[in-house]
Curated annotation (Swiss-Prot):
This is Tungsten-containing formylmethanofuran dehydrogenase 2 subunit G. It comes from Methanopyrus kandleri (strain AV19 / DSM 6324 / JCM 9639 / NBRC 100938). The lineage of its organism: Archaea, Methanobacteriati, Methanobacteriota, Methanomada group, Methanopyri. [4Fe-4S] cluster 1 binds at residues 11, 14, 17, 70. Binds 2 [4Fe-4S] clusters. [4Fe-4S] cluster 2 binds at residues 21, 60, 63, 66. Residues 2-31, 51-79 form the 4Fe-4S ferredoxin-type domain. It comes from the Archaea. PROSITE patterns: 4FE4S_FER_1, 4FE4S_FER_2.
Length: 79
């Protein structure tokens, strides 16, 4: 089972992780275009009120792309 840990004190809501996530890109045309996902789309993470939030951890494939995309090490994938 995958656990996504968000270090909210570090996150500044840039959205790099949201756009980098391949699951998000496959499930949301907006993410594929470099924008945030819409409400109701099947995504793993998204920026909510200026901080990244886990939306559906079960969709995470533990590829670590989001973790690598974060410039401030605010997201951590634990397997």
């Amino acid at each position: 089972m995958v656990k996504i840990v968000i270090h909210e004190e570090r996150c500044h809501g840039c959205g790099n992780c949201v756009i980098a996530c391949p699951v998000n890109a496959c499930n949301s045309p907006n993410v594929w275009g470099g924008k945030g996902p819409e409400d109701g789309e099947d995504v793993v993470i998204k920026v909510v009120n200026g901080t990244v939030s886990v939306i559906n951890e079960d969709l995470c494939e533990a590829c670590m792309t989001c973790e690598l995309a974060c410039p401030v090490d605010a997201i951590e994938i634990k397997t």
